[in-house]
């Protein structure tokens, strides 16, 4: 999905003998809307894109063959929550689900974020979040954010401003504050040093994409790596909790280097996986999210 580009227009308006030249002005750029749930596309209505969360996912898995590989960097949080929405009466829900993943993560330290809920437990000296089990407190949080973010009210899915407004209201009502900083770089890359600083500080991020990819798994064999991947043509939001860079070598030469964000899919099945950078995507924004 391409980012909409609207050009300014220089208009000449005539009223009989009166001639008025209008100043060059840019029409307001409509906000992208985010709503993919494993099926995604966008429709053009005139010149303005709208995202309705319906359509197709394209398989984009690939193989890499090499003499050897190195993990250049592997920066990630040990454990995070990953929820999905199983309620068919709330379609196009990736934004409220991403918001629920964020508040679910910080609920460990801010226990009123999800009322009557314990997000995880200490296991062998490490805190582990419980898997998604469609518990009522989580379902209630998704539904609350769905309403606060006005999902599907002003169009299919949720815009960035609706997401931020709804999440801020939810966090404030729970007695906490939300802040955020950008780690966006361009349409296919994020600022990895900024993300690394955030992850090392125990924070999570968020990516907002007009088109995206999701990697279900990276399987390494002897001299061979398989990447199980799909590309989606619709707006999508995912929580981010780290990144991994892999360099491949043949005959002593580094011929390919791939970087992946660790992400929560936001799909109904609540998978965790990756999003490949410098690949099929249109990253509109990337934010480090903090609740305190």
List the model feature ranges, each with a label.
Residues 191-193, 198-202, 208-292:
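Active-site signature of cysteine proteases
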Residues 3, 87, 92-95, 160, ...:
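Active-site-proximal structural scaffolding
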Residues 1-18:
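Sec-dependent N-terminal signal peptides of Gram-positive bacterial secreted proteins and lipoproteins
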Residues 20-160:
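Active-site-adjacent structural segments surrounding the nucleophilic cysteine of cysteine proteases
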Residues 19, 61-65, 70, 177-179, ...:
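Ser/Thr- (and often Asn-) enriched beta-sheet segments in non-cytosolic proteins
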Residues 135, 139-141, 145, 150-200, ...:
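Flexible, surface-exposed loop/gating regions in the mature catalytic domains
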Residues 93-104, 179-182, 204-209, 239, ...:
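Structural recognition of the beta-strand scaffold that forms the well-ordered cores
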Residues 89-92, 100-101, 110, 150-159, ...:
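Solvent-exposed loop/turn segments at secondary-structure junctions
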